[in-house]
Amino acid sequence: MAKHPFEQFNLESSLIDAVKDLNFEKPTEIQNRIIPRILKRTNLIGQSQTGTGKSHAFLLPLMQLIDSEIKEPQAIVVAPTRELAQQLYDAANHLSQFKAGVSVKVFIGGTDIEKDRQRCNAQPQLIIGTPTRINDLAKTGHLHVHLASYLVIDEADLMIDLGLIEDVDYIAARLEDNANIAVFSATIPQQLQPFLNKYLSHPEYVAVDSKKQNKKNIEFYLIPTKGAAKVEKTLNLIDILNPYLCIIFCNSRDNANDLARSLNEAGIKVGMIHGGLTPRERKQQMKRIRNLEFQYVIASDLASRGIDIEGVSHVINFDVPNDIDFFTHRVGRTGRGNYKGVAITLYSPDEEHNISLIEDRGFVFNTVDIKDGELKEVKAHNQRQARMRKDDHLTNQVKNKVRSKIKNKVKPGYKKKFKQEVEKMKRQERKQFSKQQNRQKRKQNKKG
């Protein structure tokens, strides 16, 4: 009988059964590179986007390392949001059903802390949760985090954004000196460096460029909003799209609320994820989103980070993000695995610069507009810039010609004469260029 691809990691048979139950056919790139390193108890920094199989890249080896006979904490996984912590717990709990004798518990904010204290009477071998709640339980002595020999920090860049790195620091400081730490982050911001330097001795760096794969799976469209308001364009898009699930991203909570109000007034039912929701409202919204009550979900960047929503077929950028890293996070919600995705960005003239910065990251757009109920190609947004660059190049060429023409003839009125000569030659060059373009168009029309 052929070996299962995950057997290459020498995982115990119970975990291979768990992998089969998950229908994992073969390891992803990050799983191939991370699983052996954690099994060797390596300090590491893993840079990867969500949707790459990252969670099981660390959960599987952690489960293998846990000794089911020792009834005390052996590993800790911290996540920046309750939703992500709950998702990690669900994945780990599934694995624990195949490996007998392993206790996994989740500790997150927004729940009754007294009940959490009581749950600590039986210490779990794998602790999963948000850093603040784990800290609260550790400070009172209820949760014995100091006994853990492996700490995994997921979405570390979001820990920075949400101001949680001090809580993570407190947990790391309680560990023994020989404990190992693995840090996972989509980006490595400068603010994260002090923590990495403090706790990770000679870490291995593993970077998985999921962007290339994601870009293959995603169609990127740009829609200009010069002559129409963005809300109107969004409504027009909704008329022609039929997504399985679409996330519409806004730069701020206010923009998200305004857009939701407009769509609701137009009779469109939308879900909402932003920082203004209470923990209870947020939990209810996530449940409704996962139950597919909405085709469209409006989200702000920080509030939606750390939330893994399956089945996103479309992403609409209602606002172009000011932080270009957010663009990567946004579009990475769709086109995951072997699925195709569509990312549509609405932009106004004052957002042109940010679009150029995004293109500098290697993203390639098709510029389209909504015509006759379809997305049809229009002039690329950067054509005018290209013409300006061409004109600048033309001016330099002409100036060089003029200089050589009137060299050694410097007389009164030279500057004025020089300028007139430049303009004259530019007109001639443009005329010549225009003739060439027309000839090319005629040839193309004949071929067509």
UniProtKB/Swiss-Prot annotation:
Name of protein: DEAD-box ATP-dependent RNA helicase CshB
Domain Helicase ATP-binding: 35-206
InterPro entries, alphabetized: CshB, DEAD/DEAH_box_helicase_dom, DEAD_box_RNA_helicases, Helicase_ATP-bd, Helicase_C-like, P-loop_NTPase, RNA_helicase_DEAD_Q_motif
The EC number(s) this enzyme carries: 3.6.4.13
Catalytic activity: ATP + H2O = ADP + phosphate + H(+)
Motif Q motif, residue range(s) on this chain: 4-32
Any one of the GO CC terms: cytosol
Family note: Belongs to the DEAD box helicase family. CshB subfamily.
Subcellular compartments: Cytoplasm
Enzyme class: hydrolase
Biased composition regions of type Basic residues, renumbered to the chain: 400-418, 438-448
PANTHER family associated with the record: DEAD-BOX ATP-DEPENDENT RNA HELICASE 47, MITOCHONDRIAL, DEAD-BOX ATP-DEPENDENT RNA HELICASE CSHB
KO phenotype (gene knockout): Cold sensitive. Double cshB-nfo mutants are as cold-sensitive as the single cshB mutant.
Purpose: Probable DEAD-box RNA helicase. May work in conjunction with the cold shock proteins to ensure proper initiation of transcription at low and optimal temperatures.
HAMAP family in the cross-refs: DEAD_helicase_CshB
Segments carrying motif DEAD box: 154-157
One Pfam family per UniProt: Helicase_C
